[in-house]
């Protein structure tokens, strides 16, 4: 059948199972929006307050559902406003397709109104980018883009379409999309070598990253941990891949990881990295990282092997399939002395905070209790992000959504909106500091417009908390441009944008506020006032070995 480029785009989105698109219209993309209007019963479009909010929402939708998130923007500034979250998605391996429109083909390269080479701009931060100048290749390009976005190590793909292509016509033939194949690239000999190394270990440790969530390998990870009788630590991106209430779980590793995880990994004789990339935030000084251990790395991306840390063995392939095959090769191991030592570390070094005043750790524990650990938590970036990772028990994958690699302030609210749309039966809560919240708080208008029942918790300490913490510890308390004590009333802002607002100043007010917000089934902002000097501990100084992890008690003893 003969269809316009815009109609072909919509039909291809339907082929891919797309049910929601996040975006913002403009001149160059009008034809596409006209086609979406005609199919509004099949594809829901969420109009955000800003294109960056659309990209963050598509990102959150993808992380919460495992599907490809889709965002759209017009040419020029519309397209460039997507860039920050395209980079966010790239760093965190999120499957996303960003669709932009550009000026007509005769105007390309002439500095035309709202013309930007968005494919060139995003080349370093996408898995692939396309410029479509011929309607005949549009359908095939869209199908390739979705395949690339979700296959292997997922990531964002950009499709830039000139406006004349969206109006031109050609023959469209529908196709049936086949599921992605789970691929492995190791030999039987390599698999057996890894199994042998595991069998010889006396003090094994499992280091879990986001790849375990992407591949859907939680059940296989749990079986692996039981088989080799090992403790499990995770990264920010790996939260929820392993049951956070399990006795084997020791918390995060790295800069704000637990003492147990950091000291335990420093003592282990075998470290097995599952879908983890040895980020600098995890390893600290790479020359001193797990220096007593042999290291095995399982990852879908061959480029990650030996990139940051030299390993002794590796298996490249889809983690779920790899672990299924590896588990079948293993006999049950028992390490009672090692596990007893880890339990002693857990008992000796529990996470601690000052519970005299209202604090973010207390707030997170109350949210955990009220929601029974079953909410989807999104965060922005900073102290609150670490507290949200430390003090909420994540028991299932795709329940902690955060910008890990890029560290994008302003990410959480849009991501929470996307997650709520993708998982409408879940309670979705965004945790943001007052600094982060300012960056994209206009997306409360989006939540209000569609009555998306997200809960926005603002941890208000009136400072840029994480930067201030570094200024306190390492910069002689010179608080350069980190004080935010101004006249912004976040509750009034929320109410002005059509949301319910609650201010919390006492510990006993936290649980009732969360319970009320959940019961309202409408967008709610909860502003929580906490002291400006609260700090995130434990902590590893940048570049130091993770064995040098310290907490507030250590600082008091030194002073």
Task: Describe the residue ranges of each PLM region.
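A short acidic, glycine-rich active-site loop
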Residues: 46, 180-184, 403-406, 476-485, ...
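Catalytic phosphate/nucleotide-handling subdomain of diverse soluble enzymes
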Residues: 411, 415-453, 459
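Glycine-rich phosphate/pyrophosphate-binding beta-alpha loops
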Residues: 27-29, 76, 93, 156, ...
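Active-site diphosphate/adenylate-binding microenvironment
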Residues: 6-10, 14, 18-19, 32-37, ...
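Thiamine diphosphate
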Residues: 114, 449-542
């Amino acid at each position: 059948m003969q269809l316009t480029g815009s109609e072909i785009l919509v039909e291809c989105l339907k082929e891919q199972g797309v049910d929601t698109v996040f975006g913002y219209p403009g001149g160059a993309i009008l034809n596409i929006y006209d086609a979406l209007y005609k199919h509004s019963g099949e594809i829901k479009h969420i109009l955000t307050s800003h294109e960056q909010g659309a990209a963050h929402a598509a990102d959150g939708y993808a992380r919460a559902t495992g599907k490809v998130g889709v965002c759209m923007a017009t040419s020029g500034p519309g397209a460039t406003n997507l860039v920050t979250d395209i980079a966010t998605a790239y760093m965190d391996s999120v499957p996303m397709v960003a669709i932009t429109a550009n000026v007509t083909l005769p105007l390309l390269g002439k500095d035309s109104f709202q013309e930007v080479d968005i494919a060139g701009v995003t080349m370093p931060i996408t898995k692939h980018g396309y410029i479509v100048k011929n309607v005949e290749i549009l359908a095939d390009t869209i199908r390739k883009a979705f395949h690339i976005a979700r296959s292997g190590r997922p990531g964002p793909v950009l499709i830039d379409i000139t406006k004349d292509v969206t109006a031109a016509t050609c023959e469209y033939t529908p196709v049936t999309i086949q599921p992605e194949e789970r691929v492995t690239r190791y030999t039987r000999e390599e698999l057996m070598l890894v199994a042998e190394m595991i069998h010889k270990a006396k003090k094994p440790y499992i280091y879990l990253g986001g790849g375990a969530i992407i591949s859907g390998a939680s059940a296989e990870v749990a079986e692996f941990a039981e088989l080799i009788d090992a403790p499990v630590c995770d990264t920010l991106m790996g939260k929820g891949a392993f049951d956070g209430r399990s006795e084997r779980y020791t918390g995060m590793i790295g800069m704000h990881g637990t003492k147990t995880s950091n000291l335990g990994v420093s003592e282990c004789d075998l470290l097995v990295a599952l879908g983890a990339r040895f980020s600098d935030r995890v390893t600290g000084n790479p020359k001193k990282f797990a220096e007593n251990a042999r290291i095995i790395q399982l990852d879908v991306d061959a480029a990650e092997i030996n990139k940051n840390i030299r390993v002794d063995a590796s298996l490249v392939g889809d983690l779920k399939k790899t672990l299924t095959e590896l588990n079948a090769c293993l006999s049950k191991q028992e390490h009672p002395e090692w596990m007893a030592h880890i339990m002693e570390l857990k008992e000796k070094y529990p996470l601690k905070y000052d519970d005299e005043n209202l604090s973010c750790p207390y707030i997170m524990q109350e949210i955990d209790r009220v929601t029974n650990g079953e909410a989807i938590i999104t965060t922005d970036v900073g102290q609150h992000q670490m507290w949200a990772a430390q003090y909420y028990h994540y028991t299932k994958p795709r329940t902690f959504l955060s910008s890990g690699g890029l560290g994008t302030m302003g990410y959480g609210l849009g991501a929470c909106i996307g997650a709520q749309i993708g998982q409408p039966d879940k309670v979705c809560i965004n945790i943001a500091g007052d600094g982060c919240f300012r960056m994209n708080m206009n997306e409360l208008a989006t939540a209000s417009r569609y009555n998306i029942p997200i809960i926005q918790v603002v941890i208000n300490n009136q400072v840029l908390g994480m930067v201030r913490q570094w200024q306190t510890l390492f910069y002689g308390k010179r608080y350069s441009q980190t004080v935010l004590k101004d006249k912004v009333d976040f509750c009034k802002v929320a109410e002005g944008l059509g949301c319910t607002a609650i201010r919390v100043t006492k510990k006993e007010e936290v649980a009732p506020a969360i319970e009320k917000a959940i019961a309202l089934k409408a967008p709610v902002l909860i502003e929580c006032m906490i002291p400006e000097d609260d700090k995130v501990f434990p902590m590893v100084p940048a570049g130091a070995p993770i064995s040098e992890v310290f907490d507030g008690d250590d600082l008091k003893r030194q002073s």
